[in-house]
Design a protein with these regions (language model features):
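Terminal low-complexity/charged segments
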Residues: 1-179
């Protein structure tokens, strides 16, 4: 997540460069108060903040996703009430194997916030259905096509592939000629 228009920030939302004239001239993200509220209420949950082309992405601890989303949805003034999308990505040559990406929208702030959680080989994370019931089919799709297991999901079964299909076609190690 780097490039010419990318700015990495620490967990507190401050530029990672640590000061100086360049940091002072850096525009403040409209979601800086949201990041500050999360880091205040959930120390250690936000691992990294990235601003890219006006969009804010938070790398978060996987075991904290549900409580972060619950807070973001319920906290007055934040109210990220809509789960726009949830997807999973399989990586082969990284220290983590999966990323689960959550895109949230706040009608109150007219803003979107992206959360990313990185998972190891086991590919397990808690379901978000208790906070966003609409996560149901998104999680089933990620389970079916990528192989991420959403623990506590009320009906985690295949949604696109046949029940007896024993592969995940969106994994990077899926055979190019099919299965």
């Amino acid at each position: 997540m780097t490039g010419p228009n990318t700015e990495k920030r620490g967990a507190d939302g401050a530029p990672a460069s640590g000061g100086g004239a360049a940091a002072a001239a850096t525009p403040i993200s409209p979601l800086a108060p949201v990041v500050a509220a999360l880091t205040e209420h959930f120390p250690g949950a936000v691992l990294e903040t990235v601003e890219y082309r006006g969009e804010t992405t938070l790398l978060v601890a996987p075991d904290r996703v549900v409580e972060l989303c619950r807070f973001l949805k319920a906290e007055p003034g934040l109210e990220f009430a809509l789960l726009v999308d949830l997807c999973a990505i399989h990586w082969m040559d990284r220290e983590y194997v999966y990323e689960v990406v959550y895109l949230l929208h706040s009608f109150v702030r007219n803003a979107r916030l992206r959360l990313k959680a990185r998972l190891g080989e086991a590919g397990r994370i808690s379901t978000l259905t208790s906070v966003h019931p609409g996560a149901d089919w998104h999680e089933r799709e990620a389970f079916d096509l990528v192989g991420v297991v959403f623990e506590g999901h009320p009906d985690l079964r295949r949604i696109l592939m046949p029940e007896d299909y024993d592969a995940n076609p969106l994994r990077k190690d899926f055979p190019m000629k099919g299965y």
